[in-house]
Structures are given as structure tokens and as C-alpha cells.
Design a protein with these regions (language model features):
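Short, surface-exposed alpha-helix to beta-strand junction/turn motifs within ectodomains of secreted
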Residues: 26-47, 119-139
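A structural signal for beta-strand boundary/capping segments at domain termini and interdomain linkers
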Residues: 82-83, 174-176
Length: 198
């Protein structure tokens, strides 16, 4: 029967793909029309997307609009031989993260703002964020995904003016939050002090 050698956790969204590596994918007559790849008991091709046998050692799974699910992948050949990737769990995730609130709208370097919502974390995999199109860094901001419902953002050394927070979940679903944050490290400037003699 076919063998596979993947041993990691993978997240996939509606336009994402997964590649399975191994052997015996063609010489055993494996074909997607035979329901040859399953996520737990669900046939991948009919439930989630398409299966493409690229060669004897590679299969590509494309995820369509199927619902959210998680489980281990099983590969089945025409003879009925099957192999389950026992240490490999697939998360099919077509649900975007949702942001409901930002605790403050303006922070300076070292100050924090808390973004709350849902879908920020899936198992050990965490979402990433950008603010005003900028990635995290010492001069922009840093962040910690505290839980699936909370992200703590810390202001960096530079400035970001009214930047929209965009959350990308572990599967790659991108969510514009309609929540904005300004990082402001510019001190007010006093040019003169006028006095008046009475």
C-alpha cells in the first residue's frame, strides 16, 4: 500500500493547498475518483476540494468551500490498502477571525492595547497581525496572542497613524477588523511662550 512521511500540523483555508509526500501513490492505482484521500471518515474530494496525484510520491489536496473540520489523513489505494498519517493532523478552516474591541486607540512606545474577539488561535497555531500595512517590529509594534480571544499589542519606537488592524489566522484567512490603532511617539513642540505686561 501507499506510504507517507509527513508528521506535522497543517492548517488550510478555502484557497489553500496541502502536499502529501510518500510513495506508492500511482503504482497502486490510487485516484481521486476512488475517494482515495479522506480526512477522518470524510472523502476529501467530495467534501472539501480536489485531489491531484502529481506522481508516485506526491499528492496535492486543494481545499474548496467545505466546512471547518480537523482530523488525520487516510490514503486508500484501489486494492483497499490504506495508510493513516497518524502523527499528522489537518485543520480545514474557512472561518475568519472576528475582532470585536480594541481597549485603547492610541499608545506610545511600551504601552499596550488589547484586541479582543474570536478565532485568534487554533491549537498551538497563532494568528498574525499587521497595523496600517506594517508588520511587527521594534520600530512599529510587537504583539502576543494571549488566547483565542485576546491579542495584546505593544507600541514600538516609531509612529503609526490610525492604522487598521488586520488579522491573519493560522489557516491564512485574512480579516480586516475595522479596528484602528495609532502608535504616537512624537512629543508636542513648544515654539514660544508669550507674556503680557499689565
Amino acid at each position: 500500500g501507499p506510504d507517507s512521511d509527513n508528521d506535522k500540523l497543517v492548517h488550510v483555508k478555502s484557497d489553500g493547498t496541502i502536499t502529501i509526500l510518500g510513495s506508492g501513490f500511482t503504482n497502486s492505482g490510487i485516484a481521486s475518483s476512488d475517494g482515495s484521500v479522506k480526512l477522518e471518515s470524510d472523502d476529501w474530494a467530495s467534501t472539501y476540494g480536489t485531489v491531484t496525484v502529481n506522481n508516485d510520491g506526491q499528492i496535492t489536496l486543494a481545499n474548496g468551500s467545505g466546512g471547518n473540520a480537523s482530523g488525520r489523513i487516510t490514503v486508500l489505494d484501489f486494492a483497499g490498502n490504506e495508510t493513516t498519517v497518524s502523527d499528522y493532523t489537518i485543520f480545514v478552516d474557512n472561518t475568519k477571525a472576528v475582532s470585536t474591541n480594541i481597549s485603547v486607540g492610541v499608545v506610545k512606545q511600551g504601552a499596550t492595547a488589547v484586541l479582543t474577539g474570536t478565532g485568534f488561535k487554533n491549537g498551538d497555531a497563532e494568528s498574525t497581525i499587521t497595523i496600517g500595512g506594517q508588520n511587527a517590529g521594534a520600530t512599529t509594534f510587537t504583539y502576543t496572542v494571549d488566547s483565542g480571544t485576546q491579542i495584546t499589542i505593544t507600541g514600538g519606537s516609531g509612529d503609526i497613524n490610525d492604522g487598521e488592524i488586520v488579522v491573519t489566522d493560522p489557516a491564512g484567512n485574512v480579516s480586516t477588523t475595522n479596528k484602528k490603532l495609532t502608535v504616537d511617539n512624537t512629543k508636542p513642540s513648544v515654539s514660544s511662550v508669550a507674556t503680557e505686561t499689565i
